[in-house]
Amino acid sequence: MMILWYNPFRRMIKVKLLKIKAFHYKNCEDGVELSFLPLFRKSEEDKTYELYEVAPDLYTFLTMSIVGKNASGKTSVLNLLNDVYRILGSFQLKDEVISINGTKLEITFYENEKIYLYKTELHKQFDLGNNLSFVNESIKVMNYSKTKKNVIFKEENYKPLNMKKELPDDISILFYILKNRNNYAYYFDDLVSEEGIYHKVYDLYNKGSINKKYWKYILQLFDEHIKDLKEIKNDVYVLTTVDQTQELSAKELFHVLSSGTTKGIALYTSAIQALKEGNTFIVDEIENHFHKTLVENLIVLFKDKSVNKKGATLVFSTHYCELLDIFNRNDNIWITKYDKKIILSNMYRDYNVRNDLLKSKKFYEDNFGTAVSYELLMNLKRTLMDE
């Protein structure tokens, strides 16, 4: 009798980002890089709660955090990640207020038993409006196997993928290999535009993976008085609470519900969408407007594989270092500093910190140079006292 060997990884065609590297990106130092791969030994507990097996013995993080002082570059790092996902998902990229004209990108990703190394330069062209052109593009490929897990980032192991570009200048050649894939990331900052937030959130609920049961629990998680919220036509809503039913415009609804409730509904709705699709969810300053327990529970949802069945990734920035104590590892924690340029370092790789110690304690001891300056606080206090 013939026995067919079943490879469970063959069905996983979702693109998984492994590393990004950038030059001339905004105010970041040249060669700034963000890796999604673990840097030290993986315990069985880590494989259960911290890591997702993309392919045999190839693991990526389920959660990652960017921490640092105010104005240290956390948002710029998240913007870089979001820009990369825009290229992977829509094969186009628009220039930004702080121009990224001249940026060079190196993107390493896994897709369908292969690892790709994509390089490009982004340039502004007059005839493309706000769209950037992709210049000097190249793609190299390596067939993945367990024996190659330690040479993923060594370019000499890749072979050039030759293709003739017959696309407009503002369309990446990644289109040829990823055109049938859903490679988007949800960036929470893109959702929160005051009253416009409700339409975007309800669109996720109505057209996405958020069924009636989830919707009810999400609403009541942030305001237990809400029984239901429906969009009956564009930007007109029916809000049902324990006391009454009201028909409200988006602007009126924005003032009836608290800011925390509005942002919380948006946060959890988009997080669940990412979980259901196995996509990446990016959140800047995750603790804003939310109770610490709600934020901790969101992080735990991404770490729990009974919920996170498709390997979705949560990447967030925070000032609240106690959140990092939820992490069992420290190689998924990245630290930003600003010294003429934005510098991104890894807690495990660049600092001598034992993994079994509380991360928050090390932050409060200012081991990473991220604490608020006591001297500056005292200068402000003395100035106020002298008035």
Placement of each model-derived feature along the sequence:
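Switch/communication elements of ASCE P-loop NTPase nucleotide-binding domains
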Residues: M2-R86, T245-L376
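Phosphate-coordinating catalytic segments in nucleotide- and nucleic-acid-processing enzymes
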Residues: M2-S35, I87-K276, K361-Y374, L380-E387
